Amino acid sequence: MRKTEMLRIIALKKQTLINKVSFRLTFAEALEIGVKNAPSIIGCVVLWLLTIWVPYINVGTTIAINMLPIELAKGGVISPLGIFDAKYRKYMGDFLITTGLMIIPVFIASLFMIVPGIVLSIAWSLAYFFLFEKKKNPMQAISASNEATYGSKWTMFFVLLAFVVAAYVIAGIFAWICAAIDAGFITFVVMLALVAVIMSISLAINASFWRQLKDNVQ
C-alpha cells in the first residue's frame, strides 16, 4: 500500500462529522501529485502566457489555470491543452463575480492588521472549486468554501507557511550553488526546473485541500 494511501486511511479514521485537513497527508499528496504533473503544468503555464493577449480566449485559459487543482485532485496526469476547453469560458461571468465578491472584503479585512485578511483568504480559497465542480452560484460557492474549511484554517495556514519557507530556502540554496558554478545556461535550466516544481507542488497543495474538504458541503 502506498504511503499516501496509508496516511489517508489514518486521516479518515480521525475524522468525525467534518473532514479536516491533515498536515502530513497534504504534503504527501502534494509531492506525489506535483512531481508527477510538473511537465504538464509547465505546458499549461507556457500556453497561458502565449495566449494571454488573445481576447476572450485569455479569460478561459486564466479560469482554467485557477481550476487546475480540481483536475489534479483526481489523481491523473493533466493535459496542457485542457486549458482551452470551452467549459471554462462558460463560467466566465460567475468566475468574475466570485472574484469581485472576494477581493473587496479580503482587502478591507487586511486593513485590520493583516491577519483577518489571511483568515478570509484561506476560508474562501475553495470558492472557485465549489463554483465549477459543484455548480454553486457565486454566493453559495463562497459560503460553501467557508463551511468546508471550518476547523482546518490553522492547519491550512501552517501548511502554506511551511511550503513558502521551504521553497525560499531550497531556491536560495540552488541559487547559491549555481552562482558558485558560474554557468549561465545551467543556472537557467536548474532555476526554471525548480520554479516549475514549486508551482506544481503549490497547485497540488490546493488539490489536496480540495480532495480532503470537498465532501464537507454537498
List each language-model region with its residue ranges.
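Interfacial aromatic "cap" segments that immediately flank transmembrane helices
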Residues: 20-50, 81-108, 120-173, 204-207, ...
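Short, contiguous pre-domain boundary segments
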Residues: 4-18
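Selective recognition of hydrophobic, aromatic-rich stretches within alpha-helical transmembrane segments
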Residues: 48-78, 106-143, 182-217
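Juxtamembrane "helix-exit" motif on the non-cytosolic side of transmembrane helices
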Residues: 173-181
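Gram-positive cell-envelope targeting signals
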Residues: 1-2, 9, 22, 160
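Polybasic, lysine-rich low-complexity intrinsically disordered segments
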Residues: 3-4, 55
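Alpha-helical transmembrane segments and their immediate interhelical/interface regions
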Residues: 14-21, 28, 71-74
